[in-house]
From Swiss-Prot:
Protein name: Guanosine-5'-triphosphate,3'-diphosphate pyrophosphatase
Lineage: Bacteria, Pseudomonadati, Pseudomonadota, Gammaproteobacteria, Aeromonadales
Function: Catalyzes the conversion of pppGpp to ppGpp. Guanosine pentaphosphate (pppGpp) is a cytoplasmic signaling molecule which together with ppGpp controls the 'stringent response', an adaptive process that allows bacteria to respond to amino acid starvation, resulting in the coordinated regulation of numerous cellular activities.
Similarity comment: family membership: Belongs to the GppA/Ppx family. GppA subfamily.
Natural source organism: Aeromonas salmonicida (strain A449)
Chemical reaction(s) catalysed: guanosine 3'-diphosphate 5'-triphosphate + H2O = guanosine 3',5'-bis(diphosphate) + phosphate + H(+)
Gene Ontology BP terms: guanosine pentaphosphate catabolic process; guanosine tetraphosphate biosynthetic process; nucleobase-containing small molecule interconversion
Superkingdom of the source species: Bacteria
GO MF annotations in UniProt: guanosine-5'-triphosphate,3'-diphosphate diphosphatase activity
Gene designation per UniProt: gppA
Length: 496
């Protein structure tokens, strides 16, 4: 089989240099290589904005590592960009001359506006969302704020504050105190003050974070047993934990990786300032940002499709699933959801989309074998890259697939963080019934049905005489009723 070409994006950031190498497979991107090295370029800027020789050497050493990977990739498939620190450096030409020689490739220093726009493109390709979306990316020397809808950025700014510069300015001696955090937050608010009104007037429906700070926050919250959604109270709690440590060299937070320790307090202070200034309710982690935006720019793909739809379509293609049958199960499950939504108060925003994808991907485990297909399906979802899905959404999807037939495994449904455990169980009950109704795998064979619920009691009503004419499905439905009743959920099967 002929392999599709490789594409590479390199981001010369103010804190770290990143390289992403991908291949396009079945309409989706497959990561081949990811390399990150902490260079702390911004820490090498003096008061006259000259990069120190040591900082430049750190950058060149990193690019020597990257250069080997680029040798077999066509030049037209590579994009290398520099961001905030290289925009500021007065001796940037000295750095670029050697950097381009090492890489054997040109380097673009992109404007703050272009950086913000490219970040938004990466987010729109890799993160799902409807309506206006606020994107926050806290870099080493700049912070990008973008509001957009679908693939269009409507309002964007690149602000002169970042986790490395705020580290130097406010936590340079390593002290972690209430006063230092207050100082750092106030300074960030002063920067935000100039643009805040524009963002509040335009408004947004969802907020996503695309930086290492937000990645670190999510890792901490999951390690500490919290949901993945970032809120101001959670940020303030983490600030309290950091202050309790007293000093940067004593900072220890459960879930915080050692490589993120140094710039975490400064990034946290900036994020608290953003939350308080813009009155943000909650935020989740974006699936991608600048590097992904650069890659999709090289590919020139259109943005008309939801990120999760692209991922599902790619998996259906890669695993050779029966798409016609999958869509039939999807339509049946969504009809069942819509009937039960008022009584069960099911989440249209968080529950319905994941039920939809569970229906579309329910046969993915068959690529391994039939008997344990639900477990195999859950394993695949747990361990595959799924652009557009947050970690909690992946866990819910995995739990639904794990519970699509046979005995219920409640712990998987209760441990995911996308919806409540009770809602997850109800979604699983809907999926299981929908799969049985679609067993014939033929268009026009799904019966008309009515689902009614009162608390956990569930009644499925089918056309009169249907069960006598469809013995196998009737038998499977009776077995399913027994399973659900065994769990303590009153379930009835009627004809009318």
């Amino acid at each position: 089989m002929h392999n599709s070409p490789l594409y590479a994006a390199i981001d010369l950031g103010s804190n770290s240099f990143h390289m992403l190498v991908v291949r396009e497979v079945a309409g989706a991107l497959r990561t081949v290589t990811k390399v990150k090295r902490k260079v702390r370029l911004a820490a090498g800027l003096d008061p006259e904005f000259r990069l120190s020789r040591a900082a430049m050497e750190r950058g060149w050493d990193c690019l020597r590592l990257f250069s080997e990977q680029l040798q077999d990739i066509p030049a037209d498939n590579i994009r290398v960009v520099g961001t905030a620190t290289l925009r500021l450096a007065t001796n940037v030409d000295e750095f670029l001359s050697e950097a381009e020689r090492v890489l054997n490739h040109s380097i673009e220093i992109i404007s703050g506006e272009e950086e913000a726009k490219t970040i938004y493109e990466g987010v729109s390709w890799t993160s799902a969302g409807e309506g206006n979306r606020l994107v926050i990316d806290i870099g080493g020397a700049s912070t990008e704020l973008v509001i957009g809808e679908h693939s269009e950025a409507k309002l964007l700014n690149s602000l002169h504050m970042g986790c490395v510069t705020w580290l130097n300015n406010h936590f340079g001696d390593g002290e972690l105190s209430e006063a230092r955090f207050a100082q750092a937050i106030a300074a960030a608010k002063a920067v935000l003050e100039k643009v805040a009104e524009d963002y509040c007037v335009l408004g947004w429906r969802t907020c996503v974070g695309a930086s290492g700070t937000v990645q670190a926050l999510q890792e901490i919250m999951l390690a500490q047993g919290k949901s993945e959604r970032v809120t101001l109270p959670k940020l303030q709690e983490l600030m309290g934990q950091a202050i309790a440590c007293g000093r940067l060299d004593r900072l220890q937070l459960e879930g915080l990786a050692a490589e993120r320790l140094t710039v975490f307090p400064s990034g946290l202070a900036i994020l608290i300032a953003i939350f308080e200034t813009l009155n943000i309710e909650s935020m989740t982690l974006a699936g991608g940002a600048l590097r992904e935006g650069l890659i999709y720019g090289l590919l020139g793909n259109n943005h008309d499709c939801d990120a999760r739809d692209r991922t599902a379509d790619s998996l259906i293609s890669c695993y050779q699933l029966d798409k016609e049958h999958a869509e039939r199960v999807r339509d049946t499950a969504i009809e069942a959801f819509n009937q039960l939504q008022p009584a069960w108060r099911l989440s249209k925003r968080y529950g319905r989309p994941i039920l939809r994808y569970a229906a579309l991907l329910h046969e993915i485990g068959l690529c391994i074998e039939y008997k344990k297909a639900p477990q195999h399906a859950a394993y695949i979802i747990d361990n595959i890259d799924m652009p557009g899905f947050t970690p909690a959404q992946k866990k819910l999807l995995s739990a639904l697939l794990f519970n699509q037939r046979d005995e219920f495994k409640l712990e998987t449904l209760e441990k995911q963080g996308a919806v409540t455990g009770r809602q997850a169980i109800r979604l699983a009950r809907i999926l299981r019934i929908s799969l049985i109704l679609c067993m014939r795998r033929t268009q026009g064979t799904v019966p008309n049905f009515t689902l009614q619920a009162e608390e956990e009691a569930l009644t499925l009503t089918l056309p009169k005489g249907w069960m006598d004419e469809h013995y196998l499905r009737a038998s499977e439905l009776r077995l399913e009723v027994e399973r659900q009743q065994k769990m303590g959920w009153p379930t009835r099967l009627l004809e009318a």
